[in-house]
């Protein structure tokens, strides 16, 4: 399968997983709910580096379930970014501005995307897509926010990846809210 892209970039963008999880490693409750995160929404005190991160990316990648979850929040928050939704279905729910649905080989698509994009790429999630990206060695950096809550169950951040992955910690930051930001490289820059 071949994919066509509009942009032609000179820099090699990095794929960055930017995500929050509970202390026990869950990104959502069993039903997909992330209500436990609302206490930590961006506020006037801090946006936890989100604005800077968001400005550094041109592309958003997510799975179908994550897409449907984000649609439930109201206005589409990524309208000015090109978004690719990985799905095995023909056409999930609604198509928002700048959204394209993708099926097929994750690795092949993503490698072609990186060759034709000039800014970094945000891997939003969910768990199944994160696993596929890690299995194919496609993630370059992880920015993980540990939220001070134990959910006791739910959708895990890392679900049976099937291999060991060594990380290099590049930065940590602790916020007054109790959140801990940890940054890792999976591949050398």
What are these regions (language model features)?
Residues 2-189:
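Enzymes that bind and transform nitrogen-containing heteroaromatic metabolites
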């Amino acid at each position: 399968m071949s994919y066509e892209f509009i942009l032609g970039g000179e820099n090699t963008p990095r794929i960055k997983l930017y995500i929050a999880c509970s202390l026990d490693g869950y990104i959502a409750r069993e039903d997909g709910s992330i209500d436990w995160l609302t206490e930590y929404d961006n506020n006037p005190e801090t946006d936890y580096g989100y604005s800077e991160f968001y400005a550094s990316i041109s592309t958003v990648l997510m799975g179908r379930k994550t897409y449907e979850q984000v649609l439930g929040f109201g206005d589409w928050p990524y309208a000015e970014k090109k978004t690719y939704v990985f799905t095995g279905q023909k056409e999930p729910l609604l198509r928002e501005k700048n959204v394209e649905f993708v099926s097929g080989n994750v690795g092949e698509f993503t490698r072609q995307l990186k060759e034709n994009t000039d800014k970094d790429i945000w891997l939003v999630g969910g768990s199944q897509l994160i696993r596929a990206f890690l299995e194919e060695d496609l993630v370059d950096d992880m920015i993980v926010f540990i939220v001070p809550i134990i959910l006791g169950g739910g959708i895990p951040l890392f679900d049976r990846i099937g291999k060991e992955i060594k990380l290099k910690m590049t930065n940590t930051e602790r916020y007054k809210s109790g959140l801990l930001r940890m940054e890792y490289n999976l591949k050398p820059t």
